[in-house]
């Protein structure tokens, strides 16, 4: 199974996976409007792969088969201040506030 991955022209770190190059026929129009003009990122064989870097390969395969596309959204932003305070013991629990 091959998948074609496109980068969003409107949303940073947002990718659309489809089964065939330039075939967005199964992707909802509303999604395409919010996604912007798709920019080809790569063509990737999924057969024989056990994992992908930023997506669950089994979810990708299932979505491609069932709905014809998979939308990869950016990871949630890291709260570096909260991480720092937690590591240094300066973060308060709800009972301390």
Curated annotation (Swiss-Prot):
Pfam families: YcgL
Domain of life, source organism: Bacteria
Cross-referenced SUPFAM superfamilies: YcgL-like
Domain YcgL: residue ranges: 1-85
The protein's name: Protein YcgL
């Amino acid at each position: 199974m091959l998948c074609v991955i496109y980068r969003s022209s409107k949303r940073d770190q947002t990718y659309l996976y489809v089964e065939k190059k330039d075939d967005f026929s199964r992707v909802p129009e509303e999604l395409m409007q919010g996604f912007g003009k798709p920019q080809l990122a790569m063509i990737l064989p999924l057969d024989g792969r056990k994992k992908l870097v930023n997506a669950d390969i089994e979810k990708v395969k299932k979505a491609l088969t069932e709905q014809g596309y998979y939308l990869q959204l950016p990871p949630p932003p890291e709260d570096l201040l909260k991480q720092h305070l937690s590591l240094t013991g300066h973060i308060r629990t709800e009972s301390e506030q």
